[in-house]
C-alpha cells in the first residue's frame, strides 16, 4: 500500500529510461556538473501509506473551525445559509462539472439553459433587464461596474460610499488604477451614506455613485433619495446588493439603478475561506452591449425549436481583445449553476420566506442584546446584520467565544477606527432561538 497513490514502479522508470535511450537516472542528468549538484541527505520524511496519509490530513482538517462544528454569527459578505441537498447532486454531474461557459451550443444546451435561468432569476431579483452569466465575486463585479460607468459616461470620478464592503472598495481602487479613475470615498452618517457629503462631491466629472444595499453594516440605504443625486449630472447609479435580501426589499431597478451587482454566495455556495464565490452583474437594456462577461441568449433553430447560445460575443476579449468591454473570460459558471439550482429549489415563495426568516431572527437578536444592556450602534432599518459595541477588544471576545464553540461577529475596528470594540453580528435563517440566546448570554457575561 506504500505507493498506492503514486503508481511509479521501478519497472515503469526503466521502461521510460529505455524509451529515451539512457541507462539510468544519473545518465539522464549527466549534463549537470557535479560541482552544482546537491550533496548530502535530503530533509524529506519517508513516504506514507494511503491510510497514514489520510489520517494525517484528517487531523490537520480537524483543527479548522467551520460552520458544521461551530455556531456562526459571522457574516460581513459571507454567510451561513441553508443549501438544498439537490445542489451538490446537480453540480456534481459530469456534464455540468466545469467553470467554463460552453462555446459549442450544439452539444451544450443543458448547461446553456441553466446559465440562462440564472440570468433570468438575477434579473427578476434586481429589477433589471439584462444579467450576465457570472463574475468572479461581488468585489470584482463592483469594480467592473465602475469601469463600465467610466467608459459609458467618458468621465473619471467615482463616488464610493464608505459603507460599502471594505474589500469591495479595495478591489474598486485596484481596478481604477489602470484607466486612471479617481475614487472618492463618501463618509457614512448614522450607518448609511451621508447624503449631504455625497451632494457636495457631485459635479460634471462624476462617472458613477456606488452604494451597497443592504450596506456593510446591514443597514438599508435610502436608494430613493440617492438616485436623483447620482443622476443629477448624468452620472450612473450603481448598487451592490445581497440577492437574498432582494427577496423582500424593493429591487434597486425600481429605484432607477443603472447597474446592480453583488455576490450570489447566499444561494447554494458554501461559506469558506477564500471562496470561490459567484458575482452577478445586471444592467438596464441601454447598457446591454457594454456589459462585461458572457451572455446566454434564447433563439430558435431552422426547425423552430428553442435553443440557447452565447450572444453579443463581439464585446468579449476572445473576439476583439483590444475593444473588449472586459478581460474576463472563464467565469464562475459552476457556482452560478449552484445558485441557479438553489433558487429554483427554493422557488419565489421560498426565497421570500428565507429572507423573512433572516429579518425576524436578526431583529429578535437585536432586541435580546438591547434587553441585556448592549448599545446597538446604528438604529436604522436592517436586514440580517447589526452592530453592537463591546467594552473589550473584539479579537479578545471572539477568542473566548471560539472556546465555547461559537464563531463571533466581524471586528469592525479592523476597517473603521471609529468603530473600535464594535462587532458586526450576522443572524441567518439557520440560527435557532437557543443559539441566539446563548450568544447574548456569553457576550453579556463577558461584557460585564
UniProtKB/Swiss-Prot annotation:
Gene3D superfamilies: Aspartate Aminotransferase, domain 1, Type I PLP-dependent aspartate aminotransferase-like (Major domain). Its EC number is 1.4.4.2. Pfam families: GDC-P. One of its GO terms (molecular function) is glycine dehydrogenase (decarboxylating) activity. Keywords: Oxidoreductase. GO terms for biological process: glycine decarboxylation via glycine cleavage system; nucleoside metabolic process. It catalyses: N(6)-[(R)-lipoyl]-L-lysyl-[glycine-cleavage complex H protein] + glycine + H(+) = N(6)-[(R)-S(8)-aminomethyldihydrolipoyl]-L-lysyl-[glycine-cleavage complex H protein] + CO2. SUPFAM superfamilies: PLP-dependent transferases. The glycine cleavage system catalyzes the degradation of glycine. The P protein binds the alpha-amino group of glycine through its pyridoxal phosphate cofactor; CO(2) is released and the remaining methylamine moiety is then transferred to the lipoamide cofactor of the H protein. Belongs to the GcvP family. N-terminal subunit subfamily. The glycine cleavage system is composed of four proteins: P, T, L and H. In this organism, the P 'protein' is a heterodimer of two subunits. This is Probable glycine dehydrogenase (decarboxylating) subunit 1.
